[in-house]
Amino acid sequence: MRHVDGVVGNRYDDPDLDEQLHAHEDAGRLERVVLEAGQRKRSRLRVETDAGTDLGIVVDQPELRAGDVLFLDDDAAAVVEFESRTAFVVDLPSPGPETVAAAVELGHRVGNQHWDIAIEGGTVYVPVEADRRIIEDVLGEHIPDSGTTRYASVDASLFIGENAEPSGVDHSHEATDSGHGYGEDHDHDHSHDHNHDHDHNHDHDHSHSHDSHE
C-alpha cells in the first residue's frame, strides 16, 4: 500500500500542476481515484486507483476536492475525481419576479426534503435521491409555466462547490476523533469552500414538461 500524507495541490488552482498532470496523462501515467460524494469529507480512507494502486490516504484539509493530486513523481501521478450523479434539472425562464419567487420556493421545498441543490445561472439541479415521481410531485407545482424540466448526468462535484446550496441537513458526525484506520468513516465537519473551473457535462436522459403528470 502506498501511503499518502496530505494532498499535493489541486490541478484547477495550479496551472503548473495541471500541466504536469497533462504530461502524465499523455504518457499514460495518470491514475484516477473516483470517489463517491460521501467520501469527500473523510479524514482517512483507503482506496484503489483505476490502475490498481492501493492508497492509504491521510487528508490534511477539510475535504477532498475534484482535481486534488494525491501523489506526483516522475513515474506516475494520481488525481481525485467524483462519480457522476443523475439530477432533476429545472431550467427557469429569464430573470423576473416570477422566476425569483419560483427559485426561492424551490429552495424551500428542497430544503424541507433535506435534498441537495445546486444553482448555475437560471438552472437548478437536484440530485435524484428519491423516486423520480416524488421529486416531480414535490417540485412540479412551483415551476413557472415557461420553465422546463429534464434529467441529466452531472459531475457530482456540482453539489459540493460554490454552486451548492445548504440542504438543511446536519452534516455533523458522532464519531470520536481517535484511533481511526484508513477504512473508517470519519467525516470532517466543515463548510464547503471549493472552487474549480472545469465544466459540468450534462448527458441528458430525456426531457419533459413539469405539467405532464398529474
Swiss-Prot record:
It is found in: Cytoplasm. The keyword Chaperone applies. Coiled coil: none annotated. One of its GO terms (cellular component) is cytoplasm. Residues 163-214 are annotated as: Disordered. GO terms for biological process: protein folding. GO terms for molecular function: nickel cation binding; unfolded protein binding. InterPro entries: UreE, UreE_N, UreE_N_sf. The keyword Cytoplasm applies. Residues 168-214 have a biased composition (Basic and acidic residues). Keywords: Chaperone, Cytoplasm, Nickel, Nickel insertion. It holds the Pfam family UreE_N. Belongs to the UreE family. HAMAP family: UreE (MF_00822). Involved in urease metallocenter assembly. Binds nickel. Probably functions as a nickel donor during metallocenter assembly. This is Urease accessory protein UreE.
